[in-house]
Swiss-Prot record:
Keywords: Amino-acid biosynthesis, Arginine biosynthesis, ATP-binding, Cytoplasm, Ligase, Nucleotide-binding
Known pathway: Amino-acid biosynthesis; L-arginine biosynthesis; L-arginine from L-ornithine and carbamoyl phosphate: step 2/3
GO aspect biological process, one term: urea cycle
Subunit structure: Homotetramer.
MF terms (GO), sorted A to Z: argininosuccinate synthase activity; ATP binding
UniProt record similarity statement: Belongs to the argininosuccinate synthase family. Type 1 subfamily.
Annotated residues for binding of L-citrulline: Y86, N122, R126, S174, E258, Y270
Gene3D superfamilies, sorted: Argininosuccinate synthetase, chain A, domain 2, HUPs, Single helix bin
EC number assigned by the record: 6.3.4.5
PROSITE patterns: ARGININOSUCCIN_SYN_1, ARGININOSUCCIN_SYN_2
Protein name (record): Argininosuccinate synthase
Keyword Cytoplasm: yes
Pfam families documented for this protein: Arginosuc_syn_C, Arginosuc_synth
Provenance organism: Acidothermus cellulolyticus (strain ATCC 43068 / DSM 8971 / 11B)
């Protein structure tokens, strides 16, 4: 029986070339699997392209709702920002793609899964560790990395085989897009002194262009967005609408030199209007509803959660344990946040929650204040006791010298 290989297919140059390369080098049949995570492309065109490039079968899986509910929402509840800024656009989609690749391999009785990642990027790790976590027995092929395939060689291969790919050596950028955002790299951006130019952006309008502000109210239940301006929405609908509205205001542009998993620093430009607006709102609702010590510790958990996902460890035991912690921490994160979207910023202007720990009667300095200030003196004395005790010791030691 001819060996079968399932290929993670994007429709681009590298994965299109991978189809012919795998067939030539291994004699295997290639089944192309394209997962729709909201990249905004015509998936039927991509499916037909895979067949035209030599795949014996090609599948398109609409995973947009699944991506929103099971991957973007957990990232939102974790306020997931790698290095404090990057909302894990590409990193979030890879474990979902891994899941569908492994399922396809089982359906088609394939013995291997292939991807088109290079040896310099993070995605090779995310694909291979994720696939190995779901089925350790599947072999993994990485033709672009393992054959040292350059862009020039890939173009030459495509031209020699007559592959239906429109590409030129002048195409300057590498772009990865999904529902949660869009990543742009390479080209002139590799000189970190060069400022991004307006033409690279697609999800966000120029924030410097004057336009009326947009006010939006986002409602959450247990940390999950459930309504916008009072209208019930699914996670997919919430992200889609805020991508549109925040994007129209230029919200969510990020220019970052980040620490890649493989040990190099890389300049990346991102646009994630919906993600940035939602995380801004969610963080503020946590400020209102989460107790201080839990909030402090959760910030540490959030950071580690983002690092694990960035590093391709979505299916790891630690990630699962952190998920359980975050789930508990979100039990009271219910309420409404009002945002003003304008000039590239999402600014919180209002908060309300039936679970709020903010008590006006305790916080006010006006008439009606219920805070008993007579208790403060003893609290301050006890709070400062360790510091005063240490100071006396240090002063005595100094005097002894």
């Amino acid at each position: 029986m001819t060996e079968r290989v399932v290929l993670a297919y994007s429709g681009g140059l590298d994965t299109s070339v991978c189809i012919g390369w795998i067939t030539e080098q291994t004699g295997a049949e290639v089944i192309a699997v394209a997962v729709d995570v909201g990249q905004g492309e015509d998936m039927e065109v991509i499916r037909k392209r895979a067949l035209a490039c030599g795949a014996v079968e090609a599948e398109v899986i609409d995973a947009r709702a699944e991506f929103a509910a099971d991957y973007c929402v957990p990232a939102l509840r974790a306020n997931a920002l790698y290095m404090g800024r990057y909302p894990l656009i590409s990193a979030l989609s890879r474990p979902l793609i891994d899941k569908h690749l492994v399922a396809a391999a089982h359906r088609h009785k394939a013995t291997a899964v292939a991807h088109g990642s290079t040896g310099k990027g993070n995605d090779q790790v995310r694909f291979e560790v994720g696939i190995g976590s779901l089925d350790p027995e599947l072999r993994i092929l990485a033709p672009v990395r393992d054959s040292g395939m350059t862009r020039d060689r890939a173009i030459a291969f495509a031209e020699a085989k007559g592959l239906p790919i429109e590409v030129t050596k002048k195409s300057p950028y590498s772009i990865d897009a999904n529902l949660w955002g869009r990543a742009i790299e390479t080209g002139f951006l590799e000189d970190i002194w060069n400022a991004p130019i307006e033409e690279i952006y697609a999800y966000t309008a120029d924030p410097a262009v004057p336009r009326p502000a947009d006010e939006v109210v986002v409602s959450f239940s247990d940390g999950v967005p459930v309504a916008i301006d009072g209208r019930p929405v699914s996670p997919l609908e919430a992200i889609t609408e805020l991508n549109r509205r925040a994007g129209a205001q230029g919200v969510g542009r990020i220019d970052l030199v980040e620490d890649r998993l493989v040990g190099i620093k890389s300049r990346e430009v991102y646009e994630a209007p919906g993600a940035v607006a939602l995380i801004t709102a969610h963080q503020e609702l946590e400020n209102v509803t989460v107790e201080r010590d839990l909030a402090r510790f959760k910030r540490l958990v959030d950071q580690r959660w983002a690092e694990l996902v960035y590093d391709g460890l979505w299916f790891s035991p630690l990630k699962r344990a952190l998920d359980a912690f975050i789930d508990t921490a979100q039990r009271h994160v219910t309420g409404d946040i009002r945002l003003v979207l304008h000039g590239g910023r999402a600014v919180v202007t209002g908060r309300r929650s039936p679970q709020a720990l903010y008590d006006y009667r305790l916080a006010t300095y006006d008439t009606g204040d219920l805070f008993d200030q007579s208790l403060a003196k003893g609290f301050v004395e006890l709070w400062g006791l360790p510091s005063r005790t240490a100071a006396r010791r240090d002063l005595a030691a100094g005097a002894g010298e």
